[in-house]
């Protein structure tokens, strides 16, 4: 609109108009007018707000037993998610935290990881969904037997068994 220039002209007591010699449909000069101004603005805060607004989702579904469930998930694209991977030992005992810590140490020099052993695994998955972590790896008793882990994908909630040695490459390929 011409609001900014009109207000500036009003308070500065100077004319800020454009004279146009072109002719209108009636054959008369268009004359003086205050031009409209298009103000574009791009800033990091607006970009960040846009990403967060688009990423925030509340999902609802019906479980197999017929009950309703829901979750809050930040579907931040994996490449810009602040935390790429959560490493979650199933229990705080039986050597699982030690394996998880070792895996954490292997991955943390390549991307930001988060380690958590508090609460049930389902609650930990939900917390990671809410902060936008695209991958969760669960270290369980089977990990001790065959060196595989369960990887969970945030967007689909799909889980699969993979070799512990593949975790870093899978996450790096998706995120970096």
List PLM regions with ranges.
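NTP/phosphate- and nucleic-acid-binding module
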Residues: 1-176
């Amino acid at each position: 609109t011409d609001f900014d220039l009109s207000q500036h002209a009003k308070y500065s007591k100077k004319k800020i108009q454009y004279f146009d010699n072109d002719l209108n449909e009636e054959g008369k000069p268009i004359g003086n007018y205050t031009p409209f101004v298009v103000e574009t603005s791009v800033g990091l805060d607006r970009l960040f707000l846009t990403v967060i607004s688009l990423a925030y989702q509340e999902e609802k579904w019906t479980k197999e037993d017929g009950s309703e469930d829901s979750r809050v998930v930040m579907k931040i694209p994996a490449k810009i998610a602040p935390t790429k991977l959560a490493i979650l030992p199933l229990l705080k005992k039986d050597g699982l935290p030690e394996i998880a810590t070792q895996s954490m140490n292997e991955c943390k020099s390549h991307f930001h990881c988060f380690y958590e052993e508090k609460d049930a695994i389902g609650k930990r998955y939900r917390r990671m969904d809410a902060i936008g972590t695209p991958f969760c790896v669960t270290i369980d008793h089977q990990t001790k037997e065959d060196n595989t882990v369960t990887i969970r994908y945030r967007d689909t909630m799909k889980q699969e068994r993979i070799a512990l040695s593949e975790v870093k490459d899978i996450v790096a390929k998706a995120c970096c």
